């Protein structure tokens, strides 16, 4: 099911052509307490992992050049959005704590797992998501598409629901047949989605793809693919899984993948597998990645050092390796020469109390997969290790990405126990990479939502994620005022165009902010240009307004500093778009070192 919002006419940058390497779309998944009380949601971590795996498998087999990456999951217990309804989706999207979490983890898409809604006549509503839209066949999202990339998934429905609702956020509709029944072809209504062909497909009585409703085609068969007329598969009754210029969700997604992956700047570092290419020392000149502190009972579960960790039998060599791209994030490489366990002794726990054990694991050997286990192990008086399945977790793990293992349990000590360990191992004794190990009391307060940052800054050294063109295209450029990179707004169609980014979830209502940015127009051969910045703000109970942040006339080809100050009104913020613009549309505009400081 979809839900459309009226989008502004601000346009995002033209999507680049589909790349061979899939684009990474970061997703945050929250879940309600009630969802965990259902058969499908009792092991909510496994359910979320299955959602991601189903979607990514469908993308891969369909030919879609993007993959979902789970950057955060958390129980939502500060508000009640119990079922899949439009009202709950709207409230969820506008929840300030959800918005802050989205910014903290840089989630391009945000999902809430709750319960389905009885919609009458024997039907239930399994999911609902806002439709990411743009001008028809333009290849550009409207400016607020990134701000409405939220969806709800009923835990009591199938795994395909999650991929379906994320598809709406990415600009996909249901099917041609369902478009005929809705207002899509009614000229009184604006275009919905990205392209006319950005939709699912089905054949009467045979099958429907992920975005199409099977009952609209008189079938129960849902092929686990996105519509692609170039794909012929038995799941599609040995027929094409789409129709050229009619139903081609894969073509639409590949065209928009870069924009979707840039809905928000990346906050959780990407990871690599240095273990597969031999031991790789942590580069000393890289800055540490910015990550939330784990706390808990294991001390340094982020592995700034190896203190306390050892191989139980001495059959493995331990070393620290960097697993991040562009910053420093240690993981522990467990290079096993014979079967062994990675262990760390811990202080005695309270019998009968609840604890949560978690960590991330990847196999050293790329393109391999096997079962990895994480557990509390008790050492008995005779030196033997006792294993309790209730205090352990297992997961099929690959050598291509980190997988998170997590288990909540009530602690029960073994008889004649003399020592207690946290342990990690693979069933075959394969070498592992381990990170973010944590053991904490289950009754501990849930992860806190951080306050709005005092400083918001963009230096574009890691790219222009989260930024887009305003009636222009946007890209990273080496024409920078400082450092290596800046943002270039080019192919500007009008005067008063440039680039923008959403600040929703980063601003605190009622506060004053000082703004500054380095700006430049042209290459030195043109005339002077006016540069200026606005904060477009929509807050509860007030109409949308453009709050000026400053203006300056600049010499062509020269960098100048644009400065100003703004007082935000009180009340919940519904939309906040920072826009930096200029005249002389025939020239590129360059932007660098953007900053807002809370005063």
Swiss-Prot record:
| Residue intervals of the CBM-cenC domain | 458-583
Q: Which residues form the active site?
A: 165
Q: Give the catalytic activity.
A: Cleavage of Xaa-|-Asp, Xaa-|-Glu and Xaa-|-cysteic acid bonds
State if Zinc is listed as a keyword.
yes
Top-rank taxon, per record: Bacteria
Give any Gene Ontology cellular component.
cell outer membrane
- Induction summary: Its transcription is positively regulated by Vfr, the virulence factor regulator, in a cAMP-dependent manner. Constitutes an operon together with PA2782. Is expressed only during biofilm growth.
Q: Which cofactor does it need?
A: Zn(2+)
Entry keyword annotation includes Secreted: yes
Any idea of its EC number?
A: 3.4.24.33
Single GO MF annotation: metallopeptidase activity
Q: How is the cofactor bound?
A: Binds 1 zinc ion per subunit.
Q: Which InterPro entries match?
A: CenC_carb-bd (IPR003305), Galactose-bd-like_sf (IPR008979), MetalloPept_cat_dom_sf (IPR024079)
Chain residue ranges for the region called Disordered: 265-285
Q: Which UniProt keywords apply?
A: Autocatalytic cleavage, Hydrolase, Metal-binding, Metalloprotease, Protease, Secreted, Signal, Zinc, Zymogen
**Known regulation of activity:** Is inhibited by BamI, the product of its coregulated adjacent gene.
Where does the record locate the signal sequence feature?
1-20
One Pfam family per UniProt = Reprolysin_3
Q: Which GO BP annotation is one of this protein's?
A: self proteolysis
On subunit structure and binding partners, the annotation says: Interacts with BamI, the product of its coregulated adjacent gene, which inhibits its protease activity.
Report the sequence similarity comment from the record: Belongs to the peptidase M72 family.
Please quote what the entry notes about the protein's domains: Has a tridomain structure comprised of an N-terminal metzincin protease-like domain and two tandem C-terminal carbohydrate-binding domains.
Specify the protein name.
Peptidyl-Asp metalloendopeptidase
Q: Which gene encodes it?
A: mep72
């Amino acid at each position: 099911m979809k839900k459309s919002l009226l989008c502004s006419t601000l346009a995002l940058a033209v999507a680049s052509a589909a790349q061979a390497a899939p684009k990474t779309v970061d997703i945050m998944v929250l879940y309600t307490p009630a969802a965990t009380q259902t058969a499908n949601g009792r092991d909510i971590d496994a359910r979320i992992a299955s959602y991601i795996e189903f979607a990514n498998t469908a993308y891969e087999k369909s030919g879609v050049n993007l993959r979902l990456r789970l950057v955060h999951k958390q129980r939502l217990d500060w508000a009640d959005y119990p079922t899949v309804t439009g009202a709950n989706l709207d409230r969820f999207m506008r929840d300030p704590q959800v918005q802050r979490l989205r910014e903290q983890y840089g989630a391009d898409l945000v999902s809430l797992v709750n319960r389905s809604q009885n919609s009458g006549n024997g039907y239930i509503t399994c999911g609902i998501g806002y439709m990411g839209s743009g001008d028809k066949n333009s290849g550009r999202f409207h400016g607020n598409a990134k701000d409405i990339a939220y969806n709800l998934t009923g835990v009591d429905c199938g795994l395909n629901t999650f991929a379906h609702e994320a598809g709406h956020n990415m600009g996909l509709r249901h099917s041609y047949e369902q478009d005929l029944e809705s207002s899509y072809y009614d000229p009184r209504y604006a275009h919905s989605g990205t392209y006319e062909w950005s939709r699912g497909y089905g054949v009467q009585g045979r099958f429907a793809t992920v975005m199409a409703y099977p009952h609209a085609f008189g079938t129960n068969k849902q092929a686990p693919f996105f519509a692609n007329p170039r794909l012929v598969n038995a799941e599609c009754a040995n027929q094409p899984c789409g129709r050229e210029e009619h139903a081609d969700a894969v073509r639409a997604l590949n065209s928009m993948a870069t924009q979707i992956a840039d809905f928000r700047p990346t906050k959780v570092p990407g990871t690599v597998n240095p273990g597969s290419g031999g031991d790789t020392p942590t580069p000393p000149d890289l800055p540490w990645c910015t990550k939330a502190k784990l706390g808990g009972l294991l001390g340094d579960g982020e592995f700034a050092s190896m203190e306390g960790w050892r191989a139980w039998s001495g059959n493995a060599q331990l070393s620290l390796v960097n697993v991040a791209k562009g910053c420093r994030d240690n993981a522990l490489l467990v290079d096993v020469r014979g079967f062994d366990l990675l262990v760390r002794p811990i202080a005695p726990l309270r019998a009968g109390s609840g604890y949560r054990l978690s960590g991330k694991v990847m196999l050293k050997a790329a393109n391999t997969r096997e079962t990895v286990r994480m557990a509390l192990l008790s050492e008995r008086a005779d030196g033997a290790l006792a294993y309790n399945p209730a205090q352990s977790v297992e997961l099929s793990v690959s050598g291509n990405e980190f997988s998170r293992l997590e288990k909540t349990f009530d602690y029960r000590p073994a008889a004649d126990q003399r020592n207690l360990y946290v342990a990690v191992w693979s069933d075959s004794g394969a070498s592992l990479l381990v990170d973010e190990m944590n053991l904490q009391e289950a009754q501990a307060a849930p992860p806190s939502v951080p306050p709005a940052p005092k400083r918001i800054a963009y230096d574009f050294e890691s790219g222009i994620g989260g930024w887009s063109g305003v009636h222009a295209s946007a890209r990273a450029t080496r024409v920078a005022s400082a450092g290596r990179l800046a943002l270039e707004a080019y192919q500007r169609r009008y005067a008063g165009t440039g680039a923008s980014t959403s600040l929703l979830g980063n601003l605190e209502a009622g506060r004053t902010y000082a703004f500054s940015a380095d700006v430049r127009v042209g290459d030195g051969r043109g005339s002077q240009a006016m540069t200026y910045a606005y904060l477009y703000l929509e807050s509860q109970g007030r109409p949308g307004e453009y709050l000026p942040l400053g203006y300056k006339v600049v010499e062509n080809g020269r960098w100048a500093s644009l400065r100003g100050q703004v007082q935000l009104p009180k009340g919940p913020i519904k939309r906040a778009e920072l826009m930096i613009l200029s005249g002389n549309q025939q020239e590129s505009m360059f932007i660098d070192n953007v900053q807002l400081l809370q005063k």
